[in-house]
């Protein structure tokens, strides 16, 4: 690795925007990789270093470049829940169907973690598929219930997903719906939301993932 590429990686990791600009001006490659195959843009996203990320996007950095764990800058926005970073990457044309190592799109980890602002923004500002199913057989709706804490943030995430058209009858790979998971976990508020959504949808529409 040449010294300019190393400086760019270090600057992106630290969020040093001036150093990012200087490294690029000196000839550093926007798609250079560290030992874990992380690009400068991915390092900036992981640290939520917005200005550094914006400079890298302007230099043509790829929001879909995966690292050794199949994480990419775009996918990581769903993990961190950073709405401002999500918006910074949109001009770069992220692949909304890109999957992480679990087969999930960015919406799914955001729903799991209760990132209300991110879920609201990505549903409103992109064409992300609300009922995408990962390799575990879970949609964002299922994951919010199965791995969430049942509190107010996850209730709001479920409301947003349902309002965006999430199918409350979609079951996991074992045939269990989000409503049934909510009941099993003792999440009364989520169970009420999901039962009402099933009622509105008109009967048992379960067709599987």
Residue spans of the language-model regions?
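Ankyrin-repeat-protein effector appendages
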Residues: 1-7, 136, 146, 153, ...
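Intrinsically disordered, low-complexity regulatory segments in ankyrin-centric signaling systems
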Residues: 1-26, 35-38, 54, 120, ...
């Amino acid at each position: 690795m040449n010294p300019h590429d190393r400086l760019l990686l270090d600057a992106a990791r630290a969020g040093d925007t001036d150093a990012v600009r200087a490294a690029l001006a000196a000839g550093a490659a926007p798609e250079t990789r560290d030992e874990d195959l992380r690009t400068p843009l991915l390092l900036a996203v992981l640290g939520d270093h917005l200005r550094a990320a914006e400079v890298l996007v302007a230099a043509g950095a790829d929001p879909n470049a995966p690292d050794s764990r199949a994480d990419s800058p775009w996918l990581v926005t769903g993990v961190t829940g950073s709405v401002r970073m999500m918006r910074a990457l949109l001009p770069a044309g992220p692949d909304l169907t890109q999957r992480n190592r679990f087969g999930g799109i960015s919406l799914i980890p955001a729903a799991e973690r209760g990132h209300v602002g991110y879920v609201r923004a990505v549903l409103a500002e992109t064409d992300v598929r609300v009922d995408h199913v990962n390799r575990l057989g879970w949609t964002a709706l299922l994951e919010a219930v199965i791995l969430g804490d049942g509190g107010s943030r996850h209730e709001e995430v479920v409301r947003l997903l349902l309002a965006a058209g999430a199918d409350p009858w979609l079951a996991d790979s074992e045939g269990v719906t989000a409503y049934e998971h909510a009941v099993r976990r003792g999440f009364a508020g989520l169970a009420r939301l999901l039962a009402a959504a099933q009622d509105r949808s008109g009967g048992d529409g379960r067709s599987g993932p």
